[in-house]
Amino acid sequence: MIYTSSKSLQYLAVPIYTIFKNLTIILIAYGEVLFFGGKVTSMELTSFIMMVLSSVVATWGDQQAIAIKASSLEDLDQELVESTIFVLNPGYLWMFTNCISSALFVLIMRKRIRLTNFKDYDTMFYNNVLALPLLLVFSFIMEDWSTKNLSVNLSADSLAAMVISGLMSVGISYCSGWCVRVTSSTTYSMVGALNKLPIALAGLVFFDAPKNFLSFFSIFLGFLSGLLYAVAKQKKIQQQKVLAATLEK
């Protein structure tokens, strides 16, 4: 999950990456039905469809920006155009793999917390310890470990950023385990999706990400779907309370 996330960011623009992460919510929602029972309400399903639509709109905006950029270059041959557009293709493949692995990770984590009665610290510890060997293996096999590359990527600024990122990751891991334990996998993923939308907007403002109507509209749809899910969740909780009160009578 962590490795495919990094590879996705290597090829995809920040807004596209963050919007596509929302596709995982649908997999998790129906995965919870299979793992834990229950159902997905029509309003929840509508919010998921809107999230998918936001991802599709984001893709259109990304492709549109690439086409405009390619057509504006002078003396551009066909090979350069194909190489420019191809940069997106492996990114989408990595993103699809990341969606599947992320959904399985959250569902299995909640299942394991229930079975073993893990505390939040235990969840954080085992998540990171089990992931470390796989990350090391893939890093040695797939990445460039030449002296030149190490000198560029292991500068003082890069090391400081890695340390800060690592410390923040510890906090994220702990809070993730806590959120999954006290709420649900779907709610955890939806909150995470809403957290990423401001980052997607920041990518449009501060980074060299494609800026067009479709990019901004996709972010708007993402926010709207998150609000709709929150309303759907509140209604679902109220219905469960009414049903429980009826059964008690």
Swiss-Prot record:
Keywords: Cytoplasmic vesicle, Endoplasmic reticulum, Glycoprotein, Golgi apparatus, Membrane, Sugar transport, Transmembrane, Transmembrane helix, Transport. InterPro entries: SCL35B1-4/HUT1, TPT_transporter. Residues 1-15, 69-84, 144-159, 208-211 are lumenal. It is a multi-pass membrane protein. Glycans are attached at residues 149, 153. Pfam families: UAA (PF08449). Residues 37-47, 106-122, 181-186, 233-249 are cytoplasmic. GO terms for biological process: GDP-mannose transmembrane transport. GO terms for cellular component: cytoplasmic vesicle membrane; endoplasmic reticulum; endoplasmic reticulum membrane; Golgi apparatus; Golgi membrane. GO terms for molecular function: antiporter activity; GDP-mannose transmembrane transporter activity. The chain crosses the membrane at residues 16-36, 48-68, 85-105, 123-143, 160-180, 187-207, 212-232. It is found in: Golgi apparatus membrane; Cytoplasmic vesicle membrane; Endoplasmic reticulum membrane. Involved in the import of GDP-mannose from the cytoplasm into the Golgi lumen. NCBIfam families: nst. Belongs to the TPT transporter family. SLC35D subfamily. This is Probable GDP-mannose transporter 2.
